[in-house]
Amino acid sequence: GYLGGYAAPAYAGYAAPAYAGYAAPAYAAPVAAVAHAAPAVAVAHAPVPSSAANTYRISQTARLAYAAPAVAHAPLAYAAPAVAHAPLGYAAPAYGVARYAAAAPALGYGYGAYGYAAPALGYGHALVH
């Protein structure tokens, strides 16, 4: 992976199509992704009451999360805490990644079924060669 703080396009920049419907842009800086992770986490853990006030708050949080391409491009990010917690280095069972690869640090995932290695912000934890 690049050590300059950007995801390598061939590895961490794009999600495997079979598991994620949307690809994360390769140009997203990891620092920006982590900084914008809070809205996605907030949406994933937000209560779902019927009050108009909370509905508005959740919709506003979702709007902010969608502004962070590296975190919020996948619709499942709002339903699955494991996806919203990607900056913490968890695998995303909602995408089926956990069946093929262990969790990679930070934003990188290893898609074992495809033979990709996840640089994960330059740490270079190659899961499959």
UniProtKB/Swiss-Prot annotation:
It comes from Locusta migratoria. GO terms for molecular function: structural constituent of cuticle. Keywords: Cuticle, Repeat. This is Cuticle protein 12.5. The lineage of its organism: Eukaryota, Metazoa, Ecdysozoa, Arthropoda, Hexapoda. Signal peptide: none annotated. Component of the cuticle of migratory locust which contains more than 100 different structural proteins. The tetrapeptide (A-A-P-[AV]) repeats found throughout the protein are also present in many proteins constituting the protective envelope of other species. Sequence repeats lie at residues 7-10, 15-18, 23-26, 28-31, 37-40, 67-70, 79-82, 91-94, 103-106, 117-120.
